[in-house]
C-alpha cells in the first residue's frame, strides 16, 4: 500500500493579461518578456476571485476526478502566501466554502514550494492513518502583491489555484519518495513583507501595502542548482535514471530556469512539462496547475514515473517522485 494521488483539479481567473497589455503599464515589450521569461500571457484575479475562491473551485474539480465529495475529506492543507486574510486561514475558508465539515484545515507558508510542502504534510498523515482523505492545494493571487511598475516582477507573477486529493491504495503506484529543503540565509533575495507593522509612525487602522522583491539573477542561480540537487537525490534514493522519467513537472518560474534544469538533469524537452507561456508564475499554484493540465491532457498514463519539483522564497525547495 502507498499514498496515491486520487484526483487533480485547477482553476484560473477569467481575465487574461497579455504582454501587449503590460506594455501600456510598464516600460517593457512583448519580445523582451518572451525571451527572458517565456511568458506570453497570464491570468489576473478580479472581483470575487480571491485565493480561497479559486482554490475551492480547483478543489471541487479534484474531488470530482477522485470520485469523492467534500464530506469525505478528513484534512485540508493549503500552500499560499497571498490569502486575502491572515485569520481565518485560507484553508478554513475553503473548508467552509466547499462544505468539508469533518476536515481540519490549515495553511503552510513555503512560497512557490507551498504545494510540495502541503503534499508532504498530507502524505505523512495518510501514511499513519490509511483511512484519511486529504486535500492538498496551492493557491495564489500574487498580482495584488506585485508592484505593477516593477518590470522585474509585474511581468512574471500571476494568479490561479491547483489541487490534489490524496489517500491510500493497494498496489505499486503512489508517492515513492519526497524531499524538502530550506535555507533561511537567503531570505533577503526573494521576499514579500507584511503590513509594515514595525513602522511605529503608523496609527492604528492604517495599512501600508507590500510588494514582492526579487533579485532575479541570484534566484536563477540558486533555483536551478537546488532543484537539480533535490531531483538527483530522489532518483538516486529510489534507483531510477533520467531516461525512466516520463515527465518532470517543475515550478513554472521562468523558461530559462526550466530549460536549464532539464538539460542539467539529462532530460529531453519531451520529458519536461512547460505551460508558463499561458499562465506565468503562479507561485504555490504553479505545480498543481501544471500537474492537472498534464493529467487531463493525457500526458501521464498509469505506471508512468512523474517528478514534481519546486523552488521558492525562504529559500524553500523540494521534489517528489510519483509512480502514476
UniProtKB/Swiss-Prot annotation:
The residues the entry assigns to the signal sequence are none
State which pathway it belongs to: Lipid metabolism; fatty acid biosynthesis
- GO biological process assignments: fatty acid biosynthetic process
Name its cellular compartments. Cytoplasm
Which keywords annotate this record?
A: Acyltransferase, Cytoplasm, Fatty acid biosynthesis, Fatty acid metabolism, Lipid biosynthesis, Lipid metabolism, Multifunctional enzyme, Transferase
Can you name one GO molecular function term for this protein? 3-oxoacyl-[acyl-carrier-protein] synthase activity
**Active site: which residues?**
112, 251, 281
* Reactions catalysed, as given in the entry: malonyl-[ACP] + acetyl-CoA + H(+) = 3-oxobutanoyl-[ACP] + CO2 + CoA
Record's superkingdom?
Answer: Bacteria
What's the domain remark here?
The last Arg residue of the ACP-binding site is essential for the weak association between ACP/AcpP and FabH.
What is the protein's name according to its record? Beta-ketoacyl-[acyl-carrier-protein] synthase III
**Organism of provenance:** Desulfotalea psychrophila (strain LSv54 / DSM 12343)
Amino acid at each position: 500500500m502507498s499514498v496515491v494521488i486520487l484526483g487533480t483539479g485547477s482553476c484560473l481567473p477569467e481575465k487574461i493579461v497579455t504582454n501587449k497589455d503590460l506594455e501600456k503599464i510598464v516600460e517593457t515589450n512583448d519580445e523582451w518578456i518572451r525571451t527572458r521569461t517565456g511568458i506570453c500571457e497570464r491570468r489576473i484575479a478580479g472581483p470575487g476571485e480571491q485565493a480561497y475562491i479559486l482554490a475551492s473551485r480547483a478543489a471541487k474539480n479534484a474531488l470530482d476526478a477522485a470520485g469523492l465529495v467534500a464530506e469525505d475529506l478528513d484534512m485540508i492543507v493549503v500552500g499560499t502566501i497571498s490569502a486575502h486574510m491572515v485569520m481565518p486561514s485560507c484553508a478554513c475558508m475553503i473548508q467552509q466554502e466547499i462544505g468539508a465539515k469533518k476536515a481540519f484545515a490549515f495553511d503552510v507558508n513555503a512560497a512557490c514550494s507551498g504545494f510540495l510542502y502541503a503534499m508532504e504534510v498530507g502524505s505523512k498523515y495518510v501514511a499513519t492513518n490509511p483511512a484519511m482523505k486529504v486535500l492538498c492545494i496551492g493557491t495564489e493571487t500574487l498580482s495584488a502583491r506585485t508592484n505593477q511598475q516593477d518590470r522585474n516582477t509585474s511581468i512574471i507573477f500571476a494568479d490561479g489555484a491547483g489541487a490534489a486529493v490524496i489517500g491510500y491504495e493497494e498496489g505499486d503506484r503512489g508517492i515513492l519518495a519526497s524531499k524538502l529543503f530550506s535555507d533561511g540565509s537567503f531570505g533577503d533575495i526573494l521576499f514579500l513583507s507584511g503590513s509594515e507593522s514595525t513602522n511605529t509612525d503608523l496609527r492604528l487602522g492604517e495599512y501600508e501595502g507590500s510588494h514582492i522583491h526579487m533579485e532575479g539573477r541570484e534566484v536563477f542561480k540558486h533555483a536551478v542548482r537546488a532543484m537539480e540537487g533535490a531531483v538527483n537525490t530522489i532518483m538516486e534514493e529510489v534507483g531510477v535514471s533520467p531516461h525512466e522519467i516520463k515527465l518532470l513537472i517543475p515550478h513554472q518560474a521562468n523558461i530559462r530556469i526550466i530549460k536549464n534544469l532539464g538539460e542539467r538533469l539529462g532530460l529531453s524537452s519531451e520529458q519536461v512539462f512547460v505551460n508558463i507561456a499561458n499562465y506565468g508564475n503562479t507561485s504555490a499554484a504553479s505545480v498543481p496547475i501544471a500537474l492537472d493540465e498534464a493529467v487531463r491532457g493525457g500526458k501521464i498514463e498509469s505506471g508512468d514515473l512523474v517528478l514534481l519539483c519546486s523552488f521558492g522564497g525562504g529559500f524553500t525547495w523540494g521534489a517528489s517522485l510519483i509512480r502514476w
